[in-house]
Amino acid sequence: MAVITMIEAQKRSGRYNVYLDGAYAFPVSESVLVDFRLAKGMEVDKALTAQLIDADNVAKAYNRALDYLSQQLRTEKEVRDKLADLEIPAETIAATLQRLRSLALVDDAHYAASYVRTMMHTGDKGPRVIRQNLRHKGVLEQPIDEALTLYTTEEQLTVGTAVAAKLAKRYQRQPFGTQQQKIRQGLLTRGFDNDLATKMLATLDLTPDEDEQWALLVKQGEKLWHRYRTLSMRERQYKTKQALYRKGFNLDDISRWLADLGESAQ
C-alpha cells in the first residue's frame, strides 16, 4: 500500500499534486483534499486512488458547470449538453448534476418560473411558444405547466395587445382586411391562442382610413386591370375583383371601383 509523502500546491489556485512514495501520482482539487482528509503519511490503496481520481473528475466538471452557470440560469439539459461538449464522461456528468441539484444550483422548476416571468415582462411571446422554448431546453411538462400559471389571461392580454399595436403600425399601409389578418397571424405565430387574439384586436378597435384604403385599392386595381388586359371584359372584371378581395379590400369598395372604371371606359 502506498503512502502520501507530499501534497504540493499547483500554480493554479485550488489545485494540488499528490505524491505517493516520493513520486508524483495524481492531482486533486481542494474540495477532494478536504472531503477525503488527505494528509502526509496517509496510506492509499488502488481502490482509494481510483476513488480520488473519480472525485477529482467530478470536482473539475463541477467547476466547469459553475463557470457556465455564472453567466445566467441554465436548465439541467443545458448544463449536461455543455459538459458533454467538453467531452466529460456521462457518469461524471451525472454525478456533477446530482451535486448541482443538491445545492439547488440547477432547478428546472425554478428556471421555468423565472423564464416565464421574464417573457411576461420583457418579451412578446404567448404561452404556446414559451412552452415550446422550455421543452427545447429540456424542461418537463409538469414544471412548465406550473410556471405557465403565472402567465394569467390578463397578463397575456396586456402583452398581446401591445404586440398587436406594433403589428398594426407595421401593416397600416396594407388593405384593412390584410392588416387584420396579419395582426392575427402575428399573434398566433408568437404563441397566443385565437380567442385571445380576437380580444386583442377588439381592444385595439382599429378602423380603416377610407381615403387611404381607396387610394390603395385604386393603385392595386389599376395594376391588376393592366395585368388581365388580354382577357375578355367579363373575365377581366372577375379576375381583378377576385384578386383585390384576396388582398383584403372591402367587397363593396371593389365593386364601386369597377363600376367607376366601367363608366369611365364608356
UniProtKB/Swiss-Prot annotation:
Q: Which InterPro entries match?
A: RecX_HTH_1st, RecX_HTH_2nd, RecX_HTH_3rd, Regulatory_RecX, WH-like_DNA-bd_sf
- Pfam families annotated for this entry? RecX_HTH1, RecX_HTH2, RecX_HTH3
Q: Which superkingdom is the protein from?
A: Bacteria
What subcellular compartments does it reside in? Cytoplasm
Q: Please provide one cellular component term from the Gene Ontology annotations of this protein.
A: cytoplasm
Keyword Cytoplasm among record annotations: yes
State the UniProt keywords alphabetically.
Answer: Cytoplasm
Q: What is its main location?
A: cytoplasm
GO aspect biological process, one term? regulation of DNA repair
Look up the signal peptide feature and give its range.
none
The UniProt entry, under HAMAP family, shows: RecX
Sequence similarity: Belongs to the RecX family.
* Protein function: Modulates RecA activity.
Q: What is this protein called?
A: Regulatory protein RecX
Gene, per the UniProt record: recX
